[in-house]
């Protein structure tokens, strides 16, 4: 049952665990983090990186991608069966940056995947440690969510680009398991389902035969995951209909698009986890910190504390602003791409500005970029307060939905009202109300109409001082409601294209 996911904490999904108590969960998550750290130290030794180079976020991304590629079984199999010129299916690599005579140089490294797998397993007591791999995938996904706005992907499937706040996890690979499914936004799930249905419409054999049976199981599983994210009975009932359809087609696409729009006000519950780059875990392990013994949580104070004391560097292009680059990475580390900027600003203690106003491109450097003009700079990843990550979309008060917003998905459990422009959203609901789901549609629209933005619609704990590790004294910030706080919006962020 896909809905089982809701009964286990993210940490249990993260570590494929049975039901565990809090201490066991903290230990198993700590074990996972420690494994990533040990692997990173070993890779830095292999690549002969000095301490500074090892703390360079671009090197971290390359090393993370190498191990993810080494364990990508399906792609590895595909590459071996469909050899392409100049690509060795058994090797993996990427750009590694080193300081030579006061200048940054790019060096392309190539390793046997088998060798990378050996180093990874050795760092993880001989296990495949899938949880650690998923953790790195989620970090990459959070970085993509913060860097790119997925307008094109939305438009291609007939959805509105303003729905970008529903797109968390849209670049996560399929193989990211339960932990990955937990952090996917409603829009991401809808997009995956629509793509699947479209294939079925175009390819008569998609749902047929032995392969079709597997496809069908995958389809129903995805429907169940999405259903589990919705918090109102009517939205869930519509998902049941989409799932049970004998031959999914345009009617289902319509229903899914409708549901995605409804999630702008009747928010789904989407998990948030602070996944940090491997170059943060490595130095912590090297300094003698024992994550497994101390325990670790992805949704509490631990990642904040770790970032308070970490030194991470980044390459900076000539016309980029290092402070803006820092904000980008801070948001990615805290999984805050779709959080209200007012909440993020309060927690960070410095103003967090919209994507379109940031003078920075992505963190990764393309192979054709000129290295001569590159400098490096320290990323400022510290925060003024810490807050608990939430998984609630913040909408249902006793089945009566209150506010959402066209552009945020809460990350932090901080009480606020969610500003949203209801007229914009409701305008999207004129038109098609007939069809099998008309009564559910009517009910959903009614709930949306009764949503009042001025109510405090997100009951959260508040933020905490770093000295308050047990979260005993919440500080509830009061926000100025006049400036709405979405990060992407009327925006010119680059597009993510795989």
Swiss-Prot record:
InterPro entries: Flu_NP. GO terms for biological process: symbiont entry into host cell; viral penetration into host nucleus. SUPFAM superfamilies: flu NP-like. Keywords: Capsid protein, Helical capsid protein, Host nucleus, Host-virus interaction, Ribonucleoprotein, RNA-binding, Viral nucleoprotein, Viral penetration into host nucleus, Virion, Virus entry into host cell. GO terms for molecular function: RNA binding; structural molecule activity. Belongs to the influenza viruses nucleoprotein family. This is Nucleoprotein.
